[in-house]
């Protein structure tokens, strides 16, 4: 749904603002139901934040399959895999969907985070114990049929991310100064 707003600044100029909602109200309700249920069932108040993040990390990658069709054809409409809805409701995701889903959980858990991106990829940046860490569920989710949780990209420093040098995690450090 698109909402158009026009504001008259003077007799000569008008500025038009278009706001595109990423989710319908029904989708937001469904996402919140899943997030609230997972937090209620798997997270306790006395858990350290890192443990909470690991539980959510594993939940998402255990319940999501990487959407190869969307990766190969950006116009594929089979799943909404580039959104948290695709990840949490449909069970299919691409990097944007994984990052959005994780950000929603982190926000609900009051853990400071950003999504960090470049032309090719998007992942999460998480503030924990006074430092910033990278968190990439897309690259931690094994594409094979084997259900093995990886944590190569679980709360790693920028230095470690640069050591991995996979070519997809380059970012502008003048924009993401926290990293």
Where are these regions (language model features)?
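A short, highly charged nucleic-acid-interacting micro-segment common to nuclease
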Residues: 84-97
